[in-house]
Amino acid sequence: MQNFKELGISDNTVQSLESMGFKEPTPIQKDSIPYALQGIDILGQAQTGTGKTGAFGIPLIEKVVWKQGVQSLILAPTRELAMQVAEQLREFSRGQGVQVVTVFGGMPIERQIKALKKGPQIVVGTPGRVIDHLNRRTLKTDGIHTLILDEADEMMNMGFIDDMRFIMDKIPAVQRQTMLFSATMPKAIQALVQQFMKSPKIIKTMNNEMSDPQIEEFYTIVKELEKFDTFTNFLDVHQPELAIVFGRTKRRVDELTSALISKGYKAEGLHGDITQAKRLEVLKKFKNDQINILVATDVAARGLDISGVSHVYNFDIPQDTESYTHRIGRTGRAGKEGIAVTFVNPIEMDYIRQIEDANGRKMSALRPPHRKEVLQAREDDIKEKVENWMSKESESRLKRISTELLNEYNDVDLVAALLQELVEANDEVEVQLTFEKPLSRKGRNGKPSGSRNRNSKRGNPKFDSKSKRSKGYSSKKKSTKKFDRKEKSSGGSRPMKGRTFADHQK
């Protein structure tokens, strides 16, 4: 494989790349960089995690002219992605004096205006805030020679298609090189390409080892009122390193996050009403392993570039194929394996079939874990935790209590009782989730049927979405089993029947 030097990259940039651990270009970088250096328009179809930031960012650094003034503009769908792209560009150009500025909403515009006045060579921003600066004339386009649209389909999904068109129209076509990257190519993006790009070089890296996500896709059939308990059982059995859980609404995300926390899981939520400061705090916790479960809506998760996500759970099934593709694309990145589990109500199976038909592959049916499997997983987890606890020095007062208990009770029975409380602790916590109606069945035309009842009050005769709430598993009562003081334990309980659950961890 070619190295960066052979692609025409300067020694300074190669040195920066090597210091970052990049010895060889990824497939999309190898295919894109030569054309990008020549000023040719590029249409790249690639997912996050394939090295596409380097595909446009490295040649961008190489083309910087050493004078003040914006020369390159990069559009990104979210603040988080804009910041990530900007940080990578700074790393690529370390020691070369390239100034990179980010502009996005949720932050004081005055500070951004001040930064733009210093004449940065590269600006990375979200469409809305870029337009604000264009209208204020604090961002000038006369010196811009390169325009990048990163995750264009995400920007389209977020309603930025007209904003993208407005911005592209502001930069003279004669001087503009355009590079557009997108995981999918919907018709609106194709129209944008035809209108604003000049015979672009088409580069696809969707089917190579690096960019083809190695994701095991499953669906599990479960009723709404049983969904939360089934979900937490999967969490206990799978033991995900990092997991993203998708809910359909902000309310769902809030309630699901609270329910998980009450059950002892390390979780945080993200949706459109979360402040920018809180978003950054949550993402920092997720990346630093302070939490391992991120609950999010589709909009809130767009543009997130988080490595190491082992599992994606679609707590609520997405309404379209593109949303499904973007959701599960959060795992299985950069050649790593991932697991995606979609929870589906029996009447929503048409949506599973639609996704399968569109993607050309089948999902595997996955039965919910049996109680025996869940308890076994919890026991294994408790064993590991106990080993960690034993390595720590206990407080003297706890040692005193331990001695008193051991003098009073049989040691095996005592430990067994404590472990039982730990293993079954989650079962005693009662949670409440607002009942969400399943998606409507699809008609023959592929659209939801029964639309005439959309505004009717009929709904579900048994559960009204406004007044009824589903409770988490709470039928398991606290054990009333007593143990005799200083008497021998009398064997274990009878094992439950059932097949062994296939633990799909990597």
UniProtKB/Swiss-Prot annotation:
Show the GO MF annotations.
ATP binding; ATP hydrolysis activity; RNA helicase activity; RNA strand annealing activity
UniProt short sequence motif DEAD box, positions renumbered to this chain? 150-153
- Placement of sequence motif Q motif: 2-30
Instruction: Identify the main location.
Output: cytoplasm
Compositional bias ranges of the Basic residues kind: 468-480
Q: Which CDD domains match?
A: DEADc, SF2_C_DEAD
- What this chain does, per the record? DEAD-box RNA helicase possibly involved in RNA degradation. Unwinds dsRNA in both 5'- and 3'-directions, has RNA-dependent ATPase activity.
Q: Which family does it belong to?
A: Belongs to the DEAD box helicase family. CshA subfamily.
Q: What is this protein's record name? A: DEAD-box ATP-dependent RNA helicase CshA
Q: Taxonomic lineage of this organism?
A: Bacteria, Bacillati, Bacillota, Bacilli, Bacillales
Annotated gene: cshA
